[in-house]
Regions:
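Conserved beta-strand-centric core segments of catalytic alpha/beta enzyme folds
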Residues: 11-49, 107, 111-133
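Short, well-ordered amphipathic alpha-helical segments that serve as non-catalytic structural scaffolds
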Residues: 43-58, 82-86, 111
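Conserved catalytic cysteine-centered active-site region
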Residues: 71-127
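Short, positively charged and aromatic/hydrophobic N-terminal segments
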Residues: 1-12
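Metallo-beta-lactamase
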Residues: 67
Length: 133
């Protein structure tokens, strides 16, 4: 089990084109089956990684305007809307939209692609994206 998150931002606010950058990221250590991380849910680990990614990038939780988290193995009771749980546990305001993506092995990558598309379309300026299993 591990979790990784990234902060994506639009770096051309005043132009018609939007260049997008991953400004920072964080991940948890890789865990073994029934290892030391067994008592933590993916959502708890996701929140730890999300908080660290925001801290490293200097982004406040209130600045996040979309949270997109990929999760293929929704095995715990709180994983049905995992992105919302991660966002709230990381301090992102309740009014911020959250989207959980399931694209099996590519869920985390799809969350980054979706966040970039939202920024490109002007639906977001700063997004929190990542994957958790």
């Amino acid at each position: 089990m591990f979790v990784q998150t990234f902060i994506l931002v639009s770096i051309n606010h005043m132009s018609n084109t939007k260049d997008i950058a991953i400004v920072n990221g964080a991940r948890t250590p890789m865990g073994r089956y029934c290892g030391k991380l067994r008592d933590f849910t993916a959502m708890e680990l996701g929140a730890v990684a999300a908080k660290e990614a925001m801290q490293r990038s200097g982004v406040e939780p209130a600045e996040i305007d979309h949270c997109i988290i990929g999760n293929a193995q929704q095995t715990s009771g709180d994983s049905i809307y995992g992105a919302r749980h991660v966002a709230l546990k990381a301090g992102v305001p309740m009014a911020t939209p959250a989207l959980t993506v399931n694209r099996l092995c590519g869920s985390g990558m799809q969350s980054v692609v979706t966040a970039a598309q939202m920024i490109q379309l002007g639906e977001s300026t700063i997004a929190l994206a990542g994957g958790m299993e």
